[in-house]
Swiss-Prot record:
Membership in a protein family: Belongs to the ParA family. MinD subfamily.
Disruption phenotype: In a minCDE operon disruption (minC-minD-minE), cells divide not only at midpoint but also at their poles, yielding small minicells and long rods. Loss of polar localization of several polar-localized proteins including GroEL-GroES, TnaA and YqjD.
The protein's assembly and partners: Interacts with MinC and FtsZ.
Protein name per the record: Septum site-determining protein MinD
InterPro entries xref list: CobQ/CobB/MinD/ParA_Nub-bd_dom, MinD, MinD_FleN, P-loop_NTPase, ParA/MinD_ATPase
Role: ATPase required for the correct placement of the division site. Cell division inhibitors MinC and MinD act in concert to form an inhibitor capable of blocking formation of the polar Z ring septums. Rapidly oscillates between the poles of the cell to destabilize FtsZ filaments that have formed before they mature into polar Z rings.
Localization annotation: Cell inner membrane
Amino acids binding ATP: K11, G12, G13, V14, G15, K16, T17, T18
């Protein structure tokens, strides 16, 4: 049975698309047949981070409107076996996503034996976001350790509890996971950022990952490569840990303590 996981947040710029790409890639690396769908109609970015923007012929909206089949629109990732991308449309209005159309695409993906359907949601509560949230079995709430980001995430939790298909049908609630991104223990200790404990205290949902602030994320994005493929990057390692936890494995949280500087680093400001 496919698990539909929405990667969402209350505000933009927290690393949702980066996280969607990394998590989908990590699941596929674990042998899980995975598709990642870009729900951000008009602002297509997922294909850039996945490095497949030149291979986009048809998109999500083309499939919904009957202009292309799902097989025509799906892009098979060249680097990772078992991984497929369904890009968003750059040209159409956000109302092009209909509930019936999205439901049919998701049902067709399930019939194709996908084990994970990762939905990269736009920020906030616009049509694409509400559509992705509506159909989710699980939600990864992505937030920075900043007050405004955490507060907006709390609003998304309210929507998940009341406006999802599961809520409407009186089914088990959506399983909620917290993903903390751009975490910098040094800034936390200086009081510039909320601590992991602060965020957990406010949102009160289970922590699935802590992704450190890492220049490798920007470098990977610019190269069109999910950062999880960079096995030397701290962020890549943290995303790999996150995937393990999603699959039910226990993993200690890394990169949450301030690194102790040695004498020479302190002396020369390294």
């Amino acid at each position: 049975m496919a698990r539909i996981i929405v990667v969402t947040s209350g505000k933009g710029g927290v690393g949702k698309t980066t996280s969607s790409a990394a998590i989908a890639t990590g699941l596929a690396q674990k042998g899980k047949k995975t598709v990642v769908i870009d729900f951000d109609i008009g602002l297509r970015n997922l294909d850039l981070i996945m490095g497949c923007e030149r291979r986009v012929v048809y998109d999500f909206v083309n499939v919904i409107q009957g202009d292309a089949t799902l097989n025509q629109a799906l892009i098979k990732d060249k680097r990772t076996e078992n991984l497929y991308i369904l890009p968003a449309s750059q040209t159409r209005d956000k109302d092009a996503l209909t509930r019936e159309g999205v439901a049919k695409v998701l049902d067709d993906l399930k019939a194709m034996d996908f084990e994970f359907i990762v939905c990269d949601s736009p920020a906030g509560i616009e049509t694409g976001a509400l559509m992705a949230l509506y159909f989710a079995d699980e939600a990864i709430i992505t937030t920075n350790p900043e007050v405004s980001s955490v507060r907006d995430s709390d609003r998304i939790l309210g929507i998940l509890a009341s406006k999802s298909r599961r809520a409407e049908n009186g089914e088990e609630p959506i399983k909620e996971h917290l993903l903390l991104t751009r975490y910098n223990p040094g800034r936390v200790s200086r009081g510039d950022m909320l601590s992991m404990e602060d965020v957990l205290e406010i949102l009160r949902i289970k922590l699935v990952g802590v992704i450190p602030e890492d220049q490798s994320v920007l470098r990977a994005s610019n190269q069109g490569e999910p950062v999880i493929l960079d096995i030397n990057a701290d962020a890549g390692k943290a995303y790999a840990d996150t995937v393990e936890r999603l699959l039910g494995e226990e993993r200690p949280f890394r990169f949450i303590e301030e690194e102790k500087k040695g004498f020479l680093k302190r002396l020369f400001g390294g």
